[in-house]
UniProtKB/Swiss-Prot annotation:
Role played: One of the primary rRNA binding proteins, it binds directly to 16S rRNA where it nucleates assembly of the head domain of the 30S subunit. Is located at the subunit interface close to the decoding center, probably blocks exit of the E-site tRNA.
One Pfam family from the record: Ribosomal_S7
Cellular component annotations (GO), alphabetically ordered: small ribosomal subunit
Gene3D superfamilies: Ribosomal protein S7 domain
InterPro entries to which the protein is assigned, alphabetical: Ribosomal_uS7, Ribosomal_uS7_bac/org-type, Ribosomal_uS7_CS, Ribosomal_uS7_dom, Ribosomal_uS7_dom_sf
Keywords from the named record: Ribonucleoprotein, Ribosomal protein, RNA-binding, rRNA-binding, tRNA-binding
Family, per entry: Belongs to the universal ribosomal protein uS7 family.
Protein name, as recorded: Small ribosomal subunit protein uS7
GO BP annotations listed: translation
Subunit structure: Part of the 30S ribosomal subunit. Contacts proteins S9 and S11.
Lineage: Bacteria, Thermotogati, Thermotogota, Thermotogae, Thermotogales
Amino acid sequence: MRRRRAEVRKVPPDPIYNDVLVSKLINRVMWDGKKSIAQKIVYKAMEYLSEKTKKDPLEALHQAIDNVRPLVEVRPRRVGGATYQVPIEVEEPRKTSLALRWIVEAARSKKGRPMAEKLGEELVNAFNNTGTAIKKKEDVHRMAEANRAFAHFRW
C-alpha cells in the first residue's frame, strides 16, 4: 500500500481549443507517444462532430462525454470466502476517465475506416445517447442495479 495518496497531475490544455478535456482525449487516443498523430485524429473527429451536430465542437464534446459518464459501478469485495460485486458511486475524475476510455475503445473496436472518422462517429453517437460507449455505461449501471442488495458492504 502507498504511504500517502498519489498526487494528481495537472494536464495542460490543448493548443487549439484550450481545453483540458480535449487534451485528455488526445492522450487517451495516443499510441507509442505519437502525440501529433493523436492530435490530428482528435481535431478531425471534433470537426466531424460539429458538422453532424451543428453545434460548437467543444460544447458537443462536453455533452457527449457527459452522456457517457457513469454514476455507479461495481467493485469486488471479499466477505468470508464469497466475493460480492458491491455497487459504489464513481468519483468525479474517474467518471471522466471511464467515459473517455469507453469512447476510444468503442471507436477502436470498429473496423475498416480511419480512426478520426470512427472516433467522430462514436462522439456523435454519444452526443445522441446511442452507440457502444452508451451501451457500456448502461451495462455498468444494470450490473450495479442487479447487485444493489450488496450495497451495505460498502467501505
